[in-house]
Regions:
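Acidic, low-complexity cytosolic segments
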Residues: 1-172, 176-202
Length: 202
């Protein structure tokens, strides 16, 4: 599971086509590609991210698959989209959560006027931290972390319950047999119980 790119994008207005689409901040994690492929891959992912950012409605969250990649986009308002580009195995819930988190944090740091008036990339170092942290979605997302722990506990509990059921089945078969036993057998059980308790005392 990999996060390849995080992009904060100001999409152009569809009606006026102004201001032009601008990548405000970008972080890449392309170590899984060869050195010679990285610039082409980054360029393709940037194009992919800007394209889906422009075509996402305000307030919408969605995932778009392109070959081996998925672009998860959240467009918080007309001037801001966040795109998380991952491989297909990456959990959708975590990617959407990350896009939403980045969007909120970016909007706290930059005003609408700063976003609208930007003419080039802006400094947002948190993006590098997020791309490093979210490489392991189970550690980054507390819900997934708790879910994994619950799954592990559930597996242990299933084994324990299965063991109890096996014993329970044996006890049930004994109970069934005891319903078939006569009073004479019950007296034998009581006598044996007394004898065993007598022997334990000695």
């Amino acid at each position: 599971m990999k996060v390849f790119q995080l992009a904060i994008i100001r999409p152009q207005d569809r009606e006026t086509a102004q201001p032009p689409t601008l990548v405000l901040s970008l972080a890449n994690q392309l170590d899984s590609f060869s050195f010679f492929q990285r610039s082409s891959v980054e360029e393709f992912m940037r194009f992919f991210a800007t394209t889906i950012a422009e075509r996402t409605e305000v307030g919408q969250r969605q995932g778009i698959t392109q070959e081996n990649y998925v672009g998860y986009v959240y467009r918080s308002h007309a001037r801001l989209s966040v795109v998380v580009v991952t491989d297909k195995e990456y959990p959708e819930m975590v990617a959407i959560e990350l896009a939403t988190k980045i969007s909120r944090e970016f909007e706290q740091q930059f005003s609408d006027a700063q976003i609208s008036g930007a003419t080039g990339p802006v400094s947002f170092p948190a993006l590098q931290d997020y791309i490093a942290k979210y490489q392991d979605p189970h550690q980054a997302n507390t819900i997934l972390k708790v879910q994994r722990e619950l799954d592990e506990t559930k597996a242990v509990l299933h084994k324990t319950i299965e063991g109890v059921l096996e014993r329970g089945e044996k006890l049930d078969s004994l109970v069934d047999r005891s319903n078939e036993l006569s009073n004479q057998s019950k007296m034998f059980y009581k006598t044996a119980k007394k004898t065993n308790s007598c022997c334990i005392v000695m």
